[in-house]
């Protein structure tokens, strides 16, 4: 799953979470989209997002990925990136020469997939997607929380590292 930081408008306090709080944190109603992105498109999106470190007015800010781990400098440079599989195994990605042919399946929202904030080319308009779903990430988040039926621990898992 990929999103940009500007889609998140708050945080969860410790304690019970209800759907109203989910909708406050992620208030934008965007349908989920499944598509394939090349390694190069992923690297380019993270590089563009990292530029917000040198220009605070630069939208969209950093990219928040699931399945990717990366290091950026406060000068806006992408230093390292790797793909992390479901078992936690990391595979390095060459950020200086990413593959234009190696593809990753990504779930994101239609704003991001449509080139919103200029991080990606418009994959929706060009019909370069696998599926557009008739629900948004708020519903997915609520469904996930309900399915857990137990407290959820939110912790820093080290996916994004910022260095001087």
Predicted ranges, named:
Residues 1-164:
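Catalytic centers of hydrolytic enzymes
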């Amino acid at each position: 799953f990929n999103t940009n930081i500007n889609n998140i408008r708050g945080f969860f306090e410790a304690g019970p979470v209800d759907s109203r709080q989910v909708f406050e944190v992620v208030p934008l109603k965007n349908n989920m989209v499944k598509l394939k992105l090349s390694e190069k498109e992923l690297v380019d999106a993270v590089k563009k997002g990292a530029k917000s470190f040198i220009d605070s007015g630069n939208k969209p800010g950093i990219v928040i990925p699931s399945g990717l781990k990366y290091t950026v400098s406060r000068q806006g440079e992408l230093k390292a990136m790797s793909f992390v599989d479901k078992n936690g195994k990391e595979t390095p990605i060459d950020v200086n020469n990413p593959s234009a042919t190696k593809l990753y399946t990504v779930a994101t929202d239609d704003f991001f997939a449509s080139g919103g904030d200029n991080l990606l080319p418009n994959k929706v308009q060009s019909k370069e997607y696998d599926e557009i779903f008739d629900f948004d990430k708020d519903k997915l988040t609520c469904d996930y929380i309900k399915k857990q039926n137990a407290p959820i621990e939110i912790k820093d898992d080290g996916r994004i590292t910022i260095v001087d």
